[in-house]
């Protein structure tokens, strides 16, 4: 669990964020209606094949929970390195697991270890995959470098309201750490990230996968996104529950090389 204590005008405020003793699995997410079985099988195939997947969503949308669920599909023989600001991930079933955690500076302002430092170190540790708990600063540069230098199957999360917003935010974060042309940044992002999964918290407080989009390269200087799955709302039940489900749009994946090399097929897309 994580705690945060801060004082406001009325006195101290303590916020406690508790995690379940056992990680929530993809099967649980299917049962509660957060994702359909078809979409879950689709993502399972992509994780096994080594697609780089970014999970996007607002605060409290379930990004860390979903990242944990997807990590269960990583082959247990692979070497996995996780990088986090504070340890939240509950990775299970991976024997060769290295967990790196950032550290703030001491009272003298020394001995800080940043996410960027840890990502640079992770690249020297021969990982098969890297999981970054959340990208929120110029560490996005190192993450894209990892994804573009043979570390397929990497996963991360970020705060954004749509797949396009997530890519736009990544552009901004990269430019915070590198002085390069915007088109070069977009090219790096387009070649690094394969899939963006958008999560959302609906008005009935349920958490859903809203979109699964493929990053389908560049066109006229802009990154192309193609929706493979999209949540379709059909109204509300009498108790106010949002009625709808995640549906395949009929679009096919344009980038299938990783699937072919891994000998993996997807149920759709």
Q: Residue locations for each model-derived region?
A:
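Short, small-residue-biased leader/transition segments that mark boundaries at the very start
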Residues: 1-6
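Glycine-rich adenosyl-nucleotide cofactor-binding module
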Residues: 10-56
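P-loop NTPase switch/communication element
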Residues: 20-31, 48, 68, 72-120, ...
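Well-ordered alpha-helical segments embedded in enzymatic catalytic cores
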Residues: 38-42, 114-118, 139-142
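Walker A (P-loop) phosphate-binding loop of P-loop NTPases
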Residues: 60
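Conserved lysine of the Walker
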Residues: 63
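Conserved P-loop NTPase nucleotide-binding/switch module
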Residues: 84, 90-98, 122-220
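NTP-binding/hydrolysis catalytic cores, primarily Walker-type P-loop NTPases
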Residues: 205-269
